[in-house]
């Protein structure tokens, strides 16, 4: 039994070493293939980020939430967004939320307070501050134009 455990351990170790050797050979001999694969993965993750964002932007505006849902770190999400969009994840989130709020202001009769509640702001003053920072105007001014 002990001899079999040693054989299994040795086999695992050899397989692990083989994978390390293959990885280093691939990186040395085919760097462009690996770079393209990383680009494709980044684009795929960015697409998933955008899908999650559109579904959840009414409730959640934190970068960590989206990174967790994608099973990546906030730093890696930042790197992906920067490569694909040349913007941070927070800038993308805020931009999507601001555009959604614009839609609500244009297409509904909901009060600012109700829109703030819909987008999970503490109260209407937080929404107004956010909206002014993003657009340069108050929600009421935007609605009235």
Pin down the residues of each PLM region:
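…primarily DNA-binding HTH/wHTH and HhH modules…
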Residues: 129-145
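Charge-rich, low-complexity intrinsically disordered segments
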Residues: 60-90, 95
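Residues within helix-turn-helix
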Residues: 64, 75, 111-114, 124-125, ...
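Basic, amphipathic alpha-helical hairpins
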Residues: 1-5, 21-31, 48-62, 81, ...
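Terminal helix-turn-helix DNA-binding modules in bacterial transcription factors
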Residues: 83-122, 144-145
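All-alpha amphipathic helical-bundle segments outside canonical DNA-binding/catalytic cores
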Residues: 2-14
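Short hydrophobic/aromatic patch on the recognition helix
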Residues: 77-78, 126-127, 131
């Amino acid at each position: 039994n002990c001899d079999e455990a040693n054989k299994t351990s040795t086999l695992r170790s050899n397989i692990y070493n083989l994978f390390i050797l293959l990885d280093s050979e691939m990186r040395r001999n085919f760097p462009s293939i690996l770079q393209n694969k990383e680009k494709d993965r980044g684009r795929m993750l960015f697409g998933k980020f955008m899908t999650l964002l559109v579904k959840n932007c009414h409730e959640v505006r934190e970068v960590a939430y989206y990174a967790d849902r994608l099973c990546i770190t906030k730093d890696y999400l930042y790197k992906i967004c920067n490569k694909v969009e040349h913007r941070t994840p927070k800038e993308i989130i805020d931009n999507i939320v601001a555009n959604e709020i614009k839609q609500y202001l244009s297409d509904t009769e909901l009060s600012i307070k109700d829109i703030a509640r819909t987008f999970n702001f503490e109260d209407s003053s937080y929404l107004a501050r956010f909206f002014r920072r993003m657009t340069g105007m108050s929600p009421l001014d935007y609605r009235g134009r």
